[in-house]
Amino acid sequence: MQKCLPGHGRIITFMFLVDPLSQNKKVHKVMNFLSSKLSCRYNKIFCALSMIHRYILIIMCALSKPGGERCRLNSRIHFGEPLPIIISHGKLLEPADANGNVILENGDTLTLSCEGGGNLYHPNMLQSEETATISCKGGENFQNDNWLNNPSAFSSFRCSFAPNYSSRRTVRLCHQGNAVFEVGYTVQREFYALYESCFNELTLNAVYSKYTQRPYNAKFQTRVNRPFFIANDVYGAVVPVDYLFSPKGQRAAVSLLVGNMIDSYINNVDFLSRGHLAAKTDFVFAFGERATFHYVNCAPQWYGFNSGNWNTLEVDLRNFIHDTGLDTVIYTGTYGVTQLYNDNGRRVDIYLYSDENNNPVIPVPLYYYKVVYEPTSKRGIAFIGINGPHYTANEAEDLFFCNNICNRSAAFYWLTWHPHNAHEGYSFCCTVPDFRNTVGHLPSFEVTGLLM
């Protein structure tokens, strides 16, 4: 029988506690030597300690992984109002998954800015800042030692007022040489665009807005106040665009064209609203939602259509993209000019204003369209609505300019609109090539299949 060495159990235990992560060869030699000298009783103790040593190694390796706890924020829970502009990795913040979750590694930074909206606010702030960075400390907690006195809950970050968004005219051109405008935010002299508009500066008409739509857009931030529309300098100093969209202004404008028929068209039920091209809730966070309230993203739209089939299409499409996991590019635009009968029984084009040369501007569109394109599969579809509650069913049918594919396919079960309802807006669908045969607005992109 081998002779036991007294006290070696204590030595081994001490060795484990002092350096549990040691991989030194001498240590392993000592352990092997001691193991060979231990009696049965001490050998059992040694085996137990060896097992503990292994567990300690596993635990300490797990705890020593770099990064620590992640931050996890949700678009419906952790984002308050007035929300700052939020920049991550050099671009405006976007969720990481279809449920609106933002996931950051421990130590990742975000830039918060309230430019044009006062200063940042948080209950833990040490000083006022217009723009500042914060770093993830796990959960919903963020830190900045120069600005915050403790790790601080993200949901409490606010601006004094909503930050200012704006448009800028680019050097890029779109349909028929019109200018491309970008709408977004300026932070520390850097412009961050949310969407772009092809805008006709002669007729003051939004041709289309282009933006992306992803599965997370269905989880847009709620309880975001609607700001006033802004024009920047796009409409010039002469055109009273706010007044023209008001009940009094639109009534005065349309009465010049239809005379005594005005009461049949502009009343408590039928009137023109500011029709969004890119919808407010086509953007997931408050700073994106607010930026849709710009006149380069707007055209006159009959209220029944605005709140009827057009709104239904927006909601259904967001849900469809969410459920199918599509990553899409959307072109939402206008085409043609709607007509009304004047007091002589003749149809006339409807505009809201005439410029200094008596040229009509700000047309009331005949059609609104939404072309949805999925670049990965090169599939697309066009949805069209007639912006005119005063057309009869037969007149509307004559205005359908393509083969209405939604009317005969069960694949569009997810569409809940009422396409044959005049007040809500007669509506139909086309393949993209069929749509292009009539409407030549869109830039070139390859479409090889139908998105449905």
Q: Language-model segments: what does each one mean?
A:
Residues 1-48:
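Intrinsically disordered, low-complexity basic segments at termini and long loops, enriched
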Residues 32-452:
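Domain-level detector for secreted/extracellular nuclease and nuclease-toxin modules, and
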